[in-house]
Amino acid sequence: SSHRILSLGCNEVPKAGGGNYWEGDQNDARDMFKGDDPNVIRQREMVADLVLRLRNSSMLARKYQLKDIKKLIDDILSDESENGISKSQIMDTIEFGRVVHAEMNAITEAASKGVSISESSLYCTTFPCHICAKHIVASGIRRVVYIEPYPKSFAISLHSDSITLDKEKEDEK
């Protein structure tokens, strides 16, 4: 326990050869310069796939059977009510974004430099998502300290054998 920083990470798009794109990089290919978010595009494609399958199985109401699919998806996703598809779990998917979360960024940065993070602590702003959680567990990080909860994370349910929120049980896992 030397109380030193082993690695740092941030939420950013990775670049070939390691690391991330930074302001001023030549050929900066971050999403903000590409003009789209691949995760949002993929969420829309998943909704369209589901609606098309329902349509092809004659499971959509008659008034939706002949409607243009693009217009139908626009209408479906524009419903911001609690029961609308825009509030569904399918719209919470994060797997298709290009951005590497800060936790994974710090883990890969340490690995690329040959720095062991086993038995270390990770400090982050938000409770880790389920994707980061599996990397945290696999890398041997012992403790995660966070400020904000992240209710959409499935980290606890997917890794209940390895993750606990109860400080008293921390030494058991």
Put a short name on every predicted segment.
Residues 1-173:
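Zinc-dependent deaminase catalytic domain
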